[in-house]
Amino acid sequence: MLNSELYFVFPGNLNTNTGGYHYDRRVIKELRKMGSTIKTISLSEKFPFPDELALTHTEDVFSSIPDDSVVIVDGLAFGAMKNVIKLNKNRLYLVALCHHPLAMETGLNPSERELLLQSETYALKNADHVIVTSQNTRKILIEDFSISASQITVALPGTDRYPFAKC
């Protein structure tokens, strides 16, 4: 039986003003509105290229999470923590939140791109479930990463409705 407390794991500062972190905050907010208890856990900001200290800290964090817990991990970290996933895939319910594949980031050199592609492929194939932010990302994960469509949920980002300003 799965633990009722959810863990949401992300690299760096959740209050960083980017679209990805805004999406993460919104997912947490909506899960809480649905009655879920969410424990947020910050990892090193060095992801997706963590050093040994960051990986050791990540291993310690994951080892402290109770067995059978649902752990949602932002893709900026999830795709770059192969060994952590190996150590925990049989005791935790791991959910990857993939905004887009890490190897598709701009500015990567070929060796960085290949490293991320290998690591993220392993990570996604060993996730219990994957949340993506678009139909396009879903299609990429199915076609290029061989992730089963049944393992993927599309949760589109949206905008809040506001009344029109009076003229």
Please provide the spans of the model-predicted regions.
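Membrane-proximal helix-turn-helix segments that form the acceptor-binding/catalytic region
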Residues: 111-132
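N-terminal beta-loop-helix "entrance" segment that forms/cooperates
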Residues: 44-62
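A short, histidine- and acid-enriched strand-loop-helix "catalytic/donor-clamping" loop
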Residues: 45-47, 79-80, 97-112, 126
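Alpha-helix capping/helix-boundary segments
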Residues: 77-78, 136-138
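Carbohydrate-associated surface elements
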Residues: 136, 155-158
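Short N-terminal targeting/anchoring amphipathic segment
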Residues: 58-82, 93-96
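N-terminal subdomain of nucleotide-sugar transferases
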Residues: 1-46, 67
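Short beta-strand scaffold positions
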Residues: 22, 73, 132-133, 154
